């Protein structure tokens, strides 16, 4: 049985955690186990679940203290003598790959799961690190073509040296369930409302404040509409202030950070993701699997949509009113005939059970190449 050093950085609620955990839950753990390296300021480490599945959690200093972070990582790696390191930290992979090289780990996988945007404060650092992010890695992965090309370059991608493993979900857990939809809507008092939803970190990247602008325009056209927001982040207070400013507090359900996500996909009538950038977002696949019309910004790769009849891509240059009109049109078209899209999502290659077997095979082939 092979233990893989999985470098998570900050393990917060959201796409990266969901992606890696779905692969871990479904991979054959008699052949491969994951040791998770997480920054100590992570707020959503499922330690109990990981340990029940046979994995281990190592907490290291936050990457803001990069020398201490690398020193602690190095001590653990030397002790455990890994043969595979798999890092999910984008351009920050440079540092973990260097540690892996120092420790003599022969297989060092750098994975890209996101991109960048000029409006994001972190973009300057990402652009500085990007030319060096291939250093010390032996293998390259991405969860979509767009983020693979963004981090590793067209040449490496076109040469077939970047392996794409898609964002994956548990299609059964996230499938459409009308009974669950009705009970959730009853519980939250939204049985007779059009419900627009968003699940994610409340950050500049996710364009949280624009979501509020869109809903403010929408609720003027559809006064009974509700906005359901799940997540937390540095823009929480700014979001709540804007809701108050618009006078729409009674139309917004803000539930903070939650783990019981499937019931809320079922309760919604449309999902909003007007992000400044994404790799291949988990929430998009989950929402479409549950039969939700999905509104992406055009800054998000079109490969993020598994269902042509549900995925809509709109420019961020469009006004909130234009977004609102398109959303209401899609919702009214979909509501009478809503159905799950599990088979389409599976066929598009987003099912965790199938893709985890491919990841296992990839690891096994890399190990075999050492002999």
Where are these regions (language model features)?
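A short, active-site helix/loop in glycosyltransferases that binds the activated sugar's phosphate group
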Residues: 137-175
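Nucleotide-activated donor-binding/catalytic signature segment of Leloir-type glycosyltransferases, i.e.
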Residues: 240-256
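A short helix/loop element that forms part of the nucleotide-sugar donor recognition site in Leloir-type
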Residues: 175-189
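Short His-centered aromatic/hydrophobic patch
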Residues: 87-95, 112
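A conserved mid-protein helix/loop that constitutes part of the nucleotide-sugar donor-binding site
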Residues: 14-22, 194, 198-217, 234-240
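N-terminal strand-loop element at the rim of the active site
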Residues: 2, 6-18, 22-68, 234, ...
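Aromatic "clamp/platform" in nucleotide-sugar-dependent glycosyltransferases that forms part
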Residues: 257, 276
